[in-house]
From Swiss-Prot:
It holds the Pfam family Tubulin_C. SMART domains: Tubulin, Tubulin_C. The keyword Ion transport does not apply. Dimer of alpha and beta chains. A typical microtubule is a hollow water-filled tube with an outer diameter of 25 nm and an inner diameter of 15 nM. Alpha-beta heterodimers associate head-to-tail to form protofilaments running lengthwise along the microtubule wall with the beta-tubulin subunit facing the microtubule plus end conferring a structural polarity. Microtubules usually have 13 protofilaments but different protofilament numbers can be found in some organisms and specialized cells. The keyword Membrane does not apply. Residues 430-441 have a biased composition (Gly residues). This is beta-Tubulin at 65B. InterPro entries: Beta-tubulin_BS, Beta_tubulin, Tub_FtsZ_C, Tubulin, Tubulin/FtsZ-like_C, Tubulin/FtsZ_2-layer-sand-dom, Tubulin/FtsZ_GTPase_sf, Tubulin_C. It comes from Drosophila melanogaster (Fruit fly). GO terms for molecular function: GTP binding; GTPase activity; metal ion binding; structural constituent of cytoskeleton. Residues 420-462 are annotated as: Disordered.
Length: 462
């Protein structure tokens, strides 16, 4: 079995992680509160060990480590479910205070050894580890600083395994902390050089989905976390269930990442409509294919029309014709040929799993590697440069042991990744500038083929 170890870090990472375990535990027939199996299909158990540890008595535990520099968030999760192993809660004694420096140098560093010890124990309990899944925000101190520290250690200790990050990126219209641009900036080197797959999310796009698509009058973080969890469930479907394509993290990496540094991906999901709208929807594969390319269905505020797609993938769930899916996806590429780079052949992939998500007959998850993401990076760079020119709030970081040169180095790294994506739109080699790729491997795993080109409302948390 090709297992994945999850690390959910900081307040946002643990909230998203908890929603993810809610969603996939139900899909696998595991009761979230007790961890007991109550499913009805052997398919629910066939590949359950990818994300769950199983006992002889059919008791299941999430293969995850819950990490925060303060204990309050993860203590609530410990009390809410027996799905989590008590020994896998790692908490410090003091919050990182929305400060990358405290997450990286002081408060986060104080619990790093315990995090790595728990990780080692989880890794030793699996048969064949394929990689790590890290859930975090880069706007706060723990999610940015401690995650960067953890990633550096994981790459050093497990160089043959992939790191997959689900990252909540600060949005200027949703900012709650004045130093978020600094924290996001300082996270850049670790994400560029140590992550293999980085799925970019932002709260502004997610709240717009809640308000515009789902017509929720009082949307909260529980709603947006649920949308993220649905999308993560879609991305991991082919890892967790048998289907047309039994993919692994490495296959996703090989198919989606043309150069090691260009691994920042935009996820999307369809359908994202209200229950009433679903009643009037035809519910066709054609509709799903159209919707996953709409900016309104992306979990990051990116306009695909403002860049070119290097690679794209659609992961479909439900009973449908593989031939129809392939034809429709190929048709999208042919009709929008100018929105795809011409130097990567067969750069649109499909995968199908017969098992639909809860409450839907069919769904589709989008993954896009687009040069339009440079607009997001430029936004982060501009915000941090504006503050750094004035040396605004810099003393909060230098007081924790950081130097101003570290900010300048991070800005250079961020500018380099912007340049890499910009040049890739013209087909220039974007693989070498600005840094290495710790623990990277560009080839498929031995023995694996490259992936083939190819009632209850889901959005309510009650």
């Amino acid at each position: 079995m090709r297992e994945i170890v999850t690390l959910q870090i900081g307040g946002a990472g643990n909230a998203i992680g908890d929603s993810f375990w809610h969603v996939i535990s139900h899909e696998h027939g595991v009761d979230y509160a007790s961890g007991r199996f109550g499913g009805t299909s052997p398919l629910q158990l066939e590949r359950i060990n990818v994300f769950f540890n199983a006992t002889a008595s059919k008791r299941f535990y999430a293969r995850t480590i819950l990490i925060d520099t303060e204990a309050s968030t993860i203590q609530r999760l410990n009390a809410s479910s027996q799905l989590y192993r008590p020994e896998n809660f790692v908490a410090g004694s003091e919050s990182a205070g929305n400060n990358f420096a405290r997450g990286y140098h002081t408060d986060g560093a104080a619990i790093l050894d315990q995090v790595l010890e728990n990780t080692r124990r989880e890794v030793e309990s699996v048969d064949s580890l394929q990689g790590f899944q890290l859930l975090h925000s880069i706007g706060g101190g723990t999610g940015s600083g401690l995650t960067s520290l953890i990633m550096e250690a994981l790459v050093e200790q497990y160089p043959d395994n992939l790191l997959c990050n689900y990252v909540t990126i600060p949005s200027p219209n949703m900012s709650q902390v004045v130093v978020e641009p600094y924290n996001a900036l300082l996270s850049t080197p670790a994400l560029v050089n140590n992550s293999h797959l980085t799925f970019c999310l932002d709260n502004e796009a997610l709240f717009q989905i809640c308000n515009r698509n789902l017509k929720l009058k009082m949307s909260g973080y529980e709603h947006i976390n649920h949308i993220v969890a649905l999308t993560m469930s879609g991305i991991t479907t082919c890892l967790r269930f048998p289907g047309q394509l039994n993919a692994g993290l490495r296959k996703i990496y090989v198919n989606m990442v043309p150069f090691p540094r260009l691994h920042f991906l935009i996820p999307g999901f369809a359908p994202l409509v209200t229950c009433k709208q679903q009643q009037f929807s035809k519910g066709t594969v054609s509709e799903l294919v159209q919707q996953i390319f709409y900016s309104n269905n992306l979990l990051c505020a990116i306009d695909l029309r403002k860049g070119k797609l290097l690679t794209a993938a659609g992961i479909f769930r439900g009973r449908m014709s593989p031939r129809e899916v392939d034809q429709l996806m190929t048709g999208v590429r042919n009709k929008n040929i100018n929105n795809f780079v011409d130097w990567i052949p067969n750069n649109i992939k499909t995968a199908i799993c017969d098992i639909p998500p809860r409450g839907l007959k069919m769904s589709a998850t989008f993954i896009g590697n687009t040069t339009a993401i440079q607009t997001l990076f430029q936004r982060l760079l501009d915000a941090s440069m504006s503050m750094l020119r004035r040396k605004a709030h810099l003393h909060w970081y230098t007081g924790e042991g950081m130097e101003e040169q570290e900010f300048q180095d991070a800005q250079q790294e961020l500018q380099a990744i912007i340049d890499d994506y910009r040049s890739s739109a013209e087909g220039e080699d974007s693989g070498g500038g600005g840094g290495g790729g710790g623990g990277r491997s560009g080839s498929a795993e031995s023995g694996e083929e490259e992936a083939t080109p190819e009632a209850h409302c889901q959005y309510c948390t009650e």
